[in-house]
Amino acid sequence: GSNLRGVCYVLDEPTIGLHPRDNRLLIDTLRDLSGRGNTVVVVEHDEETIREAGHVIDLGPGAGLHGGRVVAEGTPESLAANPESVTGRLLAHPLRHPQRPRRAVAGEAEPGAPAWLHVEGVHRHNLDGLDVALPLGRLVCVTGVSGSGKSTLVRDVLYEGLARLLAQRPERGGEAKEGVAREGAAGVRPSSATRLRPRRRTGGAATEAAVLAGLCASIQGWGEVARVLEVDQTPIGKTPRSCPATYVGVWDTIRKLFAGTPEARMRGYGPGRFSFNVAGGRCEACEGQGVRKLEMSFLPDVEVPCEVCGGARFNAETLAVRYRGLTVSEVLALPVEEALEVFAAHPAVRHALALLQDVGLGYLTLGQRSPTLSGGEAQRLKLVTELARARPGEPTRPGVSAPVEAASGQRGRSSPHTLYLLDEPTVGLHMADVEKLVRVLHRLVDVGHTVVVVEHNLDVVAEADWVVDLGPEGGDGGGRVVAEGPPETVARVRRGSHTARFLKGFLRERGVQAGGRGKPG
């Protein structure tokens, strides 16, 4: 409502968390500000916003070491004609959907139908008596305008309800099962069900109604799920000691490789010598962190490279040992894509590094400090760690553990059927990164898991096997299911669903014919 002119407005990803309907309203507001004689500078990944801009500056061409320069600038049309611009390529040739054949979701009474999870009688915030069914072993998207109850359903009810039920599940030994973890807590690594953080146990068996009190009346079909895991964009660690190599589980193997070199054996060094977390081989001046923190009175603390090791983390004696011509410090400085070549002969390391490369994180260095990772990078690291546990070609069945190949390359651990919950995972992701994220989600489902995503991004919604749209509005005007089914079915809904209206045009433009199966029988 301001009539100011000559103002420079700077906005950093203002479309975060907005439904396509609200996104259109935001763009109209920005155009109005610009039309009044103001300058509007927006940092944005949203395709619609980029297409509406009068001038676009594209940085890249890649991420990390491969970026940092202006590769194109001008109108969106000129960007689309620039072969060096990844953004321009996706403007000229948007993603087509579905990228892979959609998994069939038959009704429960039909042969070959997947197991279903029924959440009944939800009473939470604006959800009043809601009943919803989700197919297991599928990629499920929960959509709706802001405030329609999506996060309440998925995080407050589905996650919390399954967490309580799984904590009550008896093991063979009679104890409650530890099958719950809210991934995203700093330093918490995805792991097998027996290593996950347990919920507080109640004294004795409780009825399901008592366990779910305050959430919903019942959750049917939860016995098919062995684990529930929320994967968010919070940092994987808050100290320089945490890095991609330690998080995905390859650093122990790399340390053993260094300990097995002739020089290390001659000096009597074991794997512990090449750890920056324990005394012996690390630089004691910085305790293996490579930096020292200077406390500034009345100012934020400042980190500077260690003056003793110069940021190498290890002492001179440890750095005298080389593996394929590289010191342990130089290995930590290797980008994933280069480390793949160095450790190509070691399946234990190659498998996890190849997954990092596949999801677009090949530019990260093995020793990059976790606090410097973006939210999207941290989230993909967590998903890669989960993928590294699942052996390709041997999918799980709901409720059944399948043999897997761990990051160590050894077979024998089990991959329990896991329900992954992600709340708007595309926040902060470029269109090219969204494509990579979708591939990761599909791979998790391909090995037998279930992925439930709260999302506004239509590139993700169009890839789902099943969509549940809440609404029709936010707050008191929402809280009910207005459409459900495969994306093509939801797109045919004519009334009550804002998502259907935008999804219909999106699917028409991206080469998908309207048509699909209906609601389960």
Task: Give the location of each predicted region.
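Conserved phosphate-binding elements of NTP-dependent enzyme cores
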Residues: G1-G521
